[in-house]
C-alpha cells in the first residue's frame, strides 16, 4: 500500500488465493489505487505480471514507485478500466508476447471510491467534509457533481437516486435540490438532502446524504456504463483457466456483475432453471464461487469500509469459438 495514496486493500488474502491457480501471464488490476492488491499479487505469485490502471492521476503517481521494486513484472498506466482491451493488446504487442500466451490470466476490479479520495476534502466525494462539488475520479476531465445537481431535471435526479437505493424519498430530495439551486459545495448540498427527509426518519439508517452522494458520484464518473463495457472486454480477453475477480460495494454494481457472470456461466441458456438445457447453449465460463463472498469479521473490525464488500469470481473453462485452447486461431 502506497503511503502517498493510503488505501487498505479489501479482501486481499481472498484475491491472492483465488488467482493462485491461473496460468502464467498477465493480470490486470483495473482499479489500481494505492497498489495494495497489485503488490500482494506480485509478491505471492512469481508466475504473474500485473498491468495496473487507474484514471486518478494521484493514484498512478503513488502506485508507480510502489511497484517499481517488481521491475518489468509491473506496468502502470493512467486510463479508465473500459480501455483495458486496447491497453492489453498494445502492451503485449510491444513486449513480444507469443500468440499462445496473449490475453489475460486474471483481472481484478475493486470498485467504488478509495479512502484517499473520500478523505481529501478537496475532491468533493464526502458528505462529511465541506468542499467544492467535484467527485471526478479524474479531476482533469468530464462533468462535475455541480453539473449534475444543477443541470439534471427532477425526473432524471429522481431516477438516479432510486437506482442507487434511495427509493422512499428520492423525489422529495430531487425537488429540494432543484428548488435551492445553484449548488457549489458538498456541505450545503448535504444539508439540503438532510432537510428534505422527515426528522423521524433521519434518526435511523445512517446519514441521509450517503446514498444521494453515491448516486451523484456514479453519474459523474459514468461508473456503471464503463463497468458494463469493461467486464465484456475483460471476459473476452481471459485465457482458458484465467479468472476475473470483482469486489463491489453497492447493489447497482453487484447486480450488474452478477448478471454478467450468470449469463457467461450459462452460455446465455434460456431454458427453465432446474431442467436440462435444450437450447444449445455452450458455456465458456464457470462460477468459481456460488453467490458472493463477504469480508471476514476480523477484516471488518480492522477496516470498517470493507463491510459492504461483495466478491464474485468467474473462470474461463473453454477457448473462445474459433480459437484453440492455447489461444491460436483455429
Segments (PLM) and residue ranges:
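S-adenosyl-L-methionine-dependent methyltransferase catalytic core, i.e., the SAM/SAH-binding region
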Residues: 1-330
Amino acid at each position: 500500500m502506497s503511503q502517498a495514496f493510503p488505501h487498505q486493500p479489501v479482501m486481499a488474502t481472498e484475491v491472492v488465493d483465488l488467482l493462485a491457480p491461473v496460468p502464467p501471464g498477465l493480470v490486470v488490476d483495473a482499479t489500481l489505487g494505492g497498489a495494495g492488491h497489485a503488490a500482494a499479487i506480485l509478491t505471492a505469485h512469481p508466475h504473474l505480471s500485473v498491468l495496473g490502471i487507474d484514471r486518478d492521476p494521484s493514484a498512478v503517481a503513488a502506485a508507480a514507485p510502489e511497484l517499481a521494486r517488481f521491475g518489468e513484472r509491473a506496468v502502470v498506466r493512467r486510463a479508465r478500466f473500459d480501455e483495458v482491451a486496447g491497453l492489453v493488446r498494445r502492451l503485449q504487442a510491444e513486449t513480444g508476447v507469443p500468440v499462445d500466451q496473449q490475453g489475460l490470466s486474471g483481472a481484478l476490479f475493486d470498485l467504488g471510491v478509495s479512502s484517499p479520495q473520500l478523505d481529501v476534502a478537496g475532491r468533493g466525494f464526502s458528505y462529511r467534509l465541506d468542499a467544492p462539488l467535484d467527485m471526478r475520479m479524474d479531476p482533469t476531465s468530464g462533468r462535475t457533481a455541480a453539473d449534475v445537481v444543477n443541470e439534471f431535471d427532477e425526473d432524471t435526479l429522481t431516477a438516479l437516486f432510486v437506482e442507487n437505493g434511495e427509493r422512499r424519498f428520492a423525489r422529495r430530495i430531487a425537488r429540494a435540490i432543484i428548488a435551492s439551486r445553484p449548488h457549489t459545495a458538498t456541505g450545503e448540498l448535504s444539508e439540503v438532502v438532510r432537510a428534505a427527509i422527515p426528522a423521524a426518519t433521519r434518526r435511523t439508517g445512517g446519514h441521509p446524504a450517503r446514498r444521494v452522494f453515491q448516486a451523484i458520484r456514479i453519474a459523474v464518473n459514468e461508473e456503471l456504463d464503463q463497468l458494463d463495457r469493461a467486464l465484456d472486454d475483460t471476459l473476452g480477453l481471459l485465457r482458458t483457466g484465467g479468472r476475473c475477480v470483482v469486489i463491489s460495494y453497492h447493489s447497482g454494481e453487484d447486480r450488474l456483475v452478477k448478471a454478467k457472470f450468470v449469463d457467461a456461466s450459462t452460455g446465455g441458456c434460456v431454458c427453465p432453471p432446474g431442467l436440462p438445457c435444450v437450447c444449445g447453449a455452450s458455456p465458456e465460463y464457470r462460477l468459481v464461487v456460488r453467490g458472493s463472498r463477504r469480508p471476514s469479521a476480523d477484516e471488518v473490525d480492522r477496516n470498517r469500509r470493507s463491510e459492504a464488500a461483495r466478491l464474485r469470481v468467474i473462470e474461463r473453462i473453454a477457448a473462445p469459438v474459433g480459437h484453440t485452447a492455447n489461444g491460436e486461431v483455429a
